[in-house]
Structure formats: C-alpha cells, structure tokens
Amino acid sequence: CGGSTSSSDSSAAANTGDSDKVITVGATPTPHAEILNAAKDALEAEGYTLKVVEFTDYVQPNTALVDGDLDANYFQHTPYLNNFNKENGTDLAAAFDMHYEPFGIYAGKTASIEELADGASVAIPNDGSNETRALLLLQDAGLIKLKDGIDPTSDATKLDITENPKNLDIQEIAAEQLPRSLADVDLAVINGNYALQADLNAAEDSLITENPDYAKVYVNVVACRSGEENSDKIQALKKAMQSDDVKKYVDETYKGAVVTVF
C-alpha cells in the first residue's frame, strides 16, 4: 500500500544513476544470499538495485560493514553480533529479524548417538556464541553436562563441561569447516547455513536438532551501522525481505531447515 508512489519516485531517481539507490549487502551464500536474491524484484519495484556481496566466513562481513563497504549484512544471529561488538569495540546494530536455522548433530564415522564409543571425536564450531549453542545441544543429547547457569546467551567453552561420561574428544573447528570434518570425526554439530551448503537439512538429516526455544534465541538479523536502522535503504530492504513472497520462498526452498520469524 502506497508502494506505487514511492516506486515511481525511486525509479526516477535510480534512472539518474543515483548511488543512493544501490543497496549493497554482504551475506554468506546459503541461505542468506539466496534469500536476498529472492527480494531483488521487490526492491527493484521500489527503485532500488540490490548488490549482494558473498562472504564465506563470519568476520569479513562485519569488518566490511564497519569500514563502510556495505550498507548492511545478513549472516549472523544476535548473540554473535553482540559478541563481535564486545570483542572489537564496534557499534553495529540489528536492523530487523529474519529467520533462525536449527543446529543439528550429524553422523560422521559413527552412525548414531547410541553407538558412540568411549573417546569418540565430536566437532563443534569454535566461535563463542555458536560454541555455546553446540555444547547445549550436546547436553540435550545426554552426552555432556555443563556448569549450572549456562544458557543460550552465555559464552561457554569446553572448560564449562562438568561431566563427560564417554570421554568425548570435543574438537573446536571453524564453523565453515564443519561439514568437511564429517569424514574425520564421529559426530559434528553444524551451523544451519553451512549444513545447507553441504546439502544437509537439519530437519531431515540430523540425528537430533536443537530445542526450538533455544533456536529462536539465535534469530538471524540484517545488521547495519548503529543509527542507520531507520534509513531509507534499510527500511526498503526490510519491506522487501519481510514480504509474503520471501516467506513463501523460504518455506518452499528450505523445508524447515530455515524458519522465518516475520
């Protein structure tokens, strides 16, 4: 509603080559860049050109945003963003919520949790908030016990394990390397986006998925520089990305491995 007016005005501005009508967003390839591309037509109707810059790690999208090379990024959940700001003294903000991706435990050399041998190897992500998430999932699976008070907002590590009855060898690995680690470890706890890139679906392929209440704590957000949340570009991006068409695309494409929250 009201879109046609802003669309015609914006299109006229875009035809003049106005760089303010180009929205540059950094994203990891799956599902983030794919979801962004599903919103391109809606942005074009509003007179904006969407430029998606793909990254394969979790650091460069934020540093590029801080440096002004991007208008926004879309790859991280709120606990990771908060932790990044804390560790780097940056001031990035969550502009709006998009989706969550359930973590899963996947079979590597061992086919099931019940078959795990004493001393079996388990790979988990090595960055703070995602390591916490993985450890909580291992606890839910009955494989370890963590110190009292550890919850999804904590910054837990292996040192917070108080009981490890199977003497699991828990290996901290860069999140993007986890799918490749499956050939070398008994189990791996894998982030939803990297699982999808490896053709793994948490809802269908994992041995166990995380508690939905925990998963919702890790809502993936579109982030921008603090103070720009209400800028024309960010608001146009929000309108396009939180559309019914994008929701339908996510539901039909990812079949429960990506869950929208709008």
Please annotate each region the language model reported.
Residues C1-D20:
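Bacterial lipoprotein signal-peptidase II cleavage site
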Residues D18-T30, Y48-E54, S121-V122:
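Short, well-ordered beta-strand elements
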Residues V52-T63, D151-R180:
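Short helix-initiation/N-cap motifs at beta->coil->alpha
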Residues V66-Q76, A120, L143, P165-D169, ...:
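Alpha-to-beta junction loops
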Residues N83-A95, K109-T110, D184, V189, ...:
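Ligand-binding "clamshell"
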Residues A95-I144, K247:
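A conserved helix-loop-strand patch within extracytoplasmic ligand-binding domains
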Residues P102-I113, Y218-S231:
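A bilobed periplasmic-binding-protein/Venus flytrap-type ligand-binding module shared by bacterial periplasmic
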Residues T132-Q139, M241-V261:
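Periplasmic-binding protein-like
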